[in-house]
Structures are given as structure tokens and as C-alpha cells.
């Protein structure tokens, strides 16, 4: 059995891939300015800073009466303070103005007495509770101060971001705008639409594998807010693969090829890419996902991913997802011992609770482990594992 020699350290491979991706995005201006409603679920290509304070005026946080707090000092149920009702944009000492949640405070007002502690009679109001300055008031800049970063470059834009952006008067933002072609290779693959009834057709498959990787990769790309197109399966034929690669790259910004990345006679992907362009990375010291490849054809990035689902998902996470998005990280104790082998980085799928538990299922193709995992741990190449109770960094997937 042939082995990939001279495996590249993960950090070195990531650095190379990320630098090439950055160059491609910068040189080809793969950034698009869109209306904020079109930005939902896409990746921000810039830091957005608040152009104003939010709120930009002092406003009532409760229904009640806007007052000058000092007027209420000493007020109680047995000793109410009586204030005259005002009806303008300004109050003076001895006055109060009826106000509703979200209303702008009148000039000079610095507190709100909740309506439950007031009794309005004719043109005055009895106040039964002392309030302090800024009580029941949302102050200028309390939510966001001018200059605060409200959306970071690399964040996926969610509905709450849209609320914030609209509140700040921001109508358009820049997002990454990319399209990925997806090609699956291998004589052993068949298309999903060739299956009428899996229970009836299972005996006819004769060891064939349904092309499921394309659907997973399609979903991963779409989750980043990018466009994706699945191409027909390409058998283990170099000329047919060349033709498919040329077509996909003519229609997309980048290409994902899954399968054929190892070094057996049937693994033709890396050699084919090399004949069409440059292979910059092939073989990384990670498990699963060792036979990862990255190349450039006609100045466009080509990712060569494993045919095994878990390995392919890991490679996508490490070399594409992590370039665009910074995963949230938590530190938690391990529920049980976790072994590793020196000289490689182990990507361990885990379940996350008050402790983190490695998923026992192993292998590069075990699909269920992807569904069950909430996050992952990266065990460095110089660590032989972790012991139960040891604190570890967990990257969250959900």
C-alpha cells in the first residue's frame, strides 16, 4: 500500500491555503455590497462600526411619568409628592410628564416613575415612590456607543444583526460573494436519482455507494451564504475529470473535488489537477483527513477532499470554514480519557454538556458521528491525549 510521504503540518497547510484564498478574494474582488435584507445568512466582509449612539436619545424604559429625580426624594405611600402635569418637550422642577416605553424623555427629566406608583388627578400627579437619577431610563449609548463594532468581519449575519443595522440607519453592507462547483469522483459511485426504492434496490447496488458527499458539501457551502452547484459524477478517468474540472471552473469561483486524493492507481484527482495547474498542498498530518489537497488552476482555488464523508467534512471545516468564520470556543473538562498519537493532529468529534465527551465511533466514513457531534477538539501533534477531568478547548459546531 502506498503512503503519502512528507505530510505537511496542519498550521503550515492552513497558512498556505488561507494566504492563497486571501489573495484570490482581494485580486478578484469577491465582495459584494448588498441591501441588509439580502445579507441574511451571508458572511460579513467587513467590520461594521456604529455611526451613532444607540439609543441616540434618553428614552423611557417603562410606562409612567418622566420626572426630575430630585423632586421625588422622600416620596412614599404615606407621604406622596405632588407634581404638576406638563405637556411639552421640557419640564422644570415640580413638574412631571406622562410617558410611554420608548418615548423620548423631555428636556431636564432624568428618571421615570412607573405608573404603578403614581396617581393622576386632574392636572397633577401623586408620586408614591422615590426614584434615583437614570432610574427606568435607557440612556444615550446604553445599548451601543458610537464607534463600537456591531458586526465583525467573518460573522454570519443573523436576524438580530439586521435589527441592529437597521436601528443604526445602515442600509447596505459588504458580504463575501463566491460560487463553488462540486465534483464527486469514483467508479464506485452512483447518483441518488438512480435509486427508486432503497429497500428494493439494495441487492442491485452490488457494492456501489450513493454519492452523498456532494449533498453534504452543497449544504456546507450554502451555510456559508455562497452559491453551490453539483456536477455529474466523474468516473476514474483522467480525461473525463479534466473536462469536468474545466467546465466547473468556467462556471464558478472555486472547486471542491471529493474522492481520488490518495495515492493508489485509481486515485487520479491530484495528478489531474497538477496537469492542469499547480498542486500546492497534498497530505497533511491530520486524522481524519490526511490526503487533503489544494491547488490552483487558472488562478482559481481547487480543494481536493477525501471521498470519506467524515474526512471530507473535517477538511472543509479546517481549510474553508475556518478561513471565513471563527468558531466559538469553550473550555470544558473531559468526561473520559482520550488517547492520541504523537506526530499528527487528531480532530475529535465530541458531545458537549457540562463535560465534553468524545464520540466513540471512529473512522473516516462514519456519517452518524457528524450528526451526533456538537463540537470538536484538536489534539496537537506533540500531545499524547488528555486525561479525564482535564480542561480542553472545544470548538462549537452548534
Swiss-Prot record:
Supply one GO molecular-function term: molybdopterin molybdotransferase activity
What is its pathway?
Cofactor biosynthesis; molybdopterin biosynthesis
Q: Which Gene3D superfamilies match?
A: MoaB/Mog-like domain, MoeA, C-terminal, domain IV, Molybdopterin biosynthesis moea protein, domain 2, Molybdopterin biosynthesis moea protein, domain 3
Signal sequence region: none
Please indicate which superkingdom the organism of origin belongs to: Archaea
Sorted keywords for this record are: Molybdenum cofactor biosynthesis
Per the record, its GO cellular-component terms are: cytoplasm
Q: What disulfide bonds does the UniProt entry report for this chain?
A: none
Question: Which InterPro entries does the record cross-reference, listed alphabetically?
Answer: MoaB/Mog-like_dom_sf (IPR036425), MoaB/Mog_dom (IPR001453), MoCF_biosynth_CS (IPR008284), MoeA-like (IPR038987), MoeA_C_domain_IV (IPR005111), MoeA_C_domain_IV_sf (IPR036688), MoeA_linker/N (IPR005110), MoeA_linker/N_sf (IPR036135)
The record ties this protein, via PANTHER family, to: MOLYBDOPTERIN BIOSYNTHESIS PROTEIN, MOLYBDOPTERIN BIOSYNTHESIS PROTEIN MJ0666-RELATED
Record's protein name: Putative molybdopterin biosynthesis protein MJ0666
Its source organism is: Methanocaldococcus jannaschii (strain ATCC 43067 / DSM 2661 / JAL-1 / JCM 10045 / NBRC 100440)
| Classification lineage | Archaea, Methanobacteriati, Methanobacteriota, Methanomada group, Methanococci
Amino acid at each position: 500500500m502506498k503512503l503519502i510521504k512528507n505530510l505537511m503540518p496542519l498550521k503550515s497547510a492552513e497558512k498556505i491555503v488561507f494566504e492563497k484564498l486571501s489573495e484570490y478574494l482581494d485580486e478578484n474582488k469577491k465582495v459584494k455590497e448588498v441591501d441588509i435584507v439580502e445579507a441574511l445568512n451571508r458572511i460579513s466582509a467587513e467590520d461594521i462600526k456604529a455611526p451613532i449612539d444607540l439609543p441616540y436619545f434618553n428614552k423611557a424604559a417603562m410606562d409612567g411619568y418622566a420626572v426630575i429625580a430630585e423632586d421625588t426624594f422622600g416620596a412614599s405611600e404615606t407621604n406622596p409628592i405632588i407634581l404638576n402635569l406638563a405637556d411639552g418637550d421640557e419640564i422644570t422642577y415640580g413638574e412631571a410628564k406622562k410617558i410611554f416605553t420608548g418615548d423620548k424623555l423631555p428636556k431636564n427629566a432624568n428618571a421615570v416613575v412607573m405608573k404603578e406608583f403614581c396617581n393622576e388627578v386632574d392636572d397633577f400627579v401623586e408620586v408614591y415612590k422615590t426614584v434615583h437619577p437614570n432610574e427606568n431610563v435607557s440612556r444615550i449609548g446604553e445599548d451601543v456607543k458610537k464607534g463600537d463594532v456591531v458586526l465583525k468581519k467573518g460573522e454570519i449575519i443573523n436576524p438580530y444583526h439586521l435589527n441592529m443595522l437597521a436601528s443604526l440607519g445602515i442600509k447596505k453592507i459588504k458580504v463575501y460573494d463566491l460560487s463553488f462547483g462540486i465534483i464527486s469522483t469514483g467508479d464506485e459511485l452512483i447518483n441518488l436519482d438512480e435509486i427508486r426504492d432503497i429497500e428494493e434496490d439494495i441487492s442491485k447496488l452490488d457494492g456501489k455507494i450513493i454519492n452523498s458527499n456532494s449533498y453534504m458539501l452543497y449544504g456546507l457551502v450554502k451555510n456559508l451564504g455562497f452559491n453551490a452547484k453539483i456536477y455529474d459524477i466523474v468516473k476514474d478517468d483522467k480525461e473525463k475529470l479534466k473536462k469536468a474540472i474545466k467546465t466547473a471552473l468556467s462556471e464558478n469561483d472555486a472547486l471542491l473535488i471529493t474522492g481520488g486524493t490518495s495515492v493508489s492507481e485509481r486515485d487520479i484527482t491530484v495528478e489531474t489537477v497538477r496537469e492542469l495547474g499547480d498542486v500546492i498542498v497534498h497530505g497533511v498530518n491530520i486524522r481524519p483527513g490526511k490526503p487533503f489537497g489544494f491547488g490552483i488552476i487558472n488562478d482559481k482555488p481547487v480543494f481536493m477532499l477525501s471521498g470519506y464523508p467524515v474526512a471530507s467534512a473535517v477538511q472543509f471545516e479546517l481549510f474553508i470554514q475556518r478561513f471565513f468564520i471563527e468558531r466559538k470556543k469553550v473550555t470544558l473538562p473531559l468526561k473520559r480519557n482520550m488517547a492520541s498519537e504523537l506526530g499528527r493532529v487528531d480532530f475529535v468529534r465530541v458531545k458537549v454538556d457540562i463535560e465534553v465527551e468524545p464520540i466513540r465511533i471512529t473512522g473516516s466514513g462514519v456519517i452518524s458521528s457528524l450528526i451526533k457531534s456538537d463540537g470538536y477538539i484538536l489534539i496537537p501533534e506533540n500531545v499524547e491525549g488528555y486525561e479525564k477531568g482535564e480542561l480542553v478547548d472545544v470548538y462549537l459546531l452548534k
